[in-house]
Amino acid sequence: MASDAKFRRVLLKISGEGLMGTREYGLDPETVDRIAREVKSVRDLGVEVCVVIGGGNIFRGVSGASSGMERAAADNMGMLATVINALSVQNALEKVGVETRVQSAIVMPTVCEAFIRRRAIRHLEKGRVVIFAAGTGNPFFTTDTAAALRAVEMGCDALLKATQVDGVYSADPKKVKDAVRYDRLTFNEVLARDLAVMDTSAIALCRENKVPIVVFDLHRPGAFAETVSGRGLFTIIAND
């Protein structure tokens, strides 16, 4: 591994909205291609990278349920949306020469591999990027929880959550001008202050398994590689 990389293996969590760019729905090809280049830059450091992507740019299960749809059915639709996003990012990565595998928690053998932990680890060891799709494969669980679960299963050194801002704030900095930005927090502080980082199930999984969460700005060029190297602006959440 390159000497300036702080982690050996990381999981990158991207929201579905992060793939929209300036659009109001769906995928923005330029944004997807830029994210692929960011992932490649980290892979080129010698870091093993796996990815979980949300589906909110296409369909969000919670929103479907609030409109009267059965929650389990809505969540299944949301999980399928993440497969579309995963295939899009896989295509973008392979265009820049990064060998990539998509593994889905919902089996669809003509589209991608089924999630098999040992196979996923072997892909990472061979230098491939692995994108985990379809969440946990079960309704009522968010893709944040899926990201935490896969990070633990893969033995990742950190879960890197790419967001719209450069870390964790006391309130939404786009709405509250005097929101306080944190450089470092404990898991217990995040839960006690009810900070909007990830859902409580994801936080609990990472806390119990000692996987730090690092929050950084998805939209700043080079931020992923800088964060993996311990530079730039980010918030790290870890045990005491």
From Swiss-Prot:
Task: Give the subcellular location.
Answer: Cytoplasm
Q: Name one GO cellular component term.
A: cytosol
- Any idea which positions bind UMP? G55, D75, T136, G137, N138, P139, F140, F141, T142, T143
The record lists ATP as bound by K13, I14, S15, G16, G56, R60, T163, Q164, Y169, D172
Domain of life, per lineage: Bacteria
InterPro entries xref list: AceGlu_kinase-like_sf (IPR036393), Asp/Glu/Uridylate_kinase (IPR001048), Uridylate_kinase (IPR011817), Uridylate_kinase_bac (IPR015963)
GO aspect biological process, one term:
UDP biosynthetic process
Which GO molecular function annotations are given, in alphabetical order? Answer: ATP binding; UMP kinase activity
Per UniProt, activity regulation is: Inhibited by UTP.
The chain's disulfide connectivity reads none
Q: Which pathway does this polypeptide act in?
A: Pyrimidine metabolism; CTP biosynthesis via de novo pathway; UDP from UMP (UMPK route): step 1/1
Instruction: Describe the function of this protein.
Output: Catalyzes the reversible phosphorylation of UMP to UDP.
NCBIfam families per the UniProt record, alphabetical: pyrH_bact (TIGR02075)
How does this protein assemble?
A: Homohexamer.
Q: Which HAMAP family match?
A: PyrH_B (MF_01220_B)
Task: State what protein this is by name.
Answer: Uridylate kinase
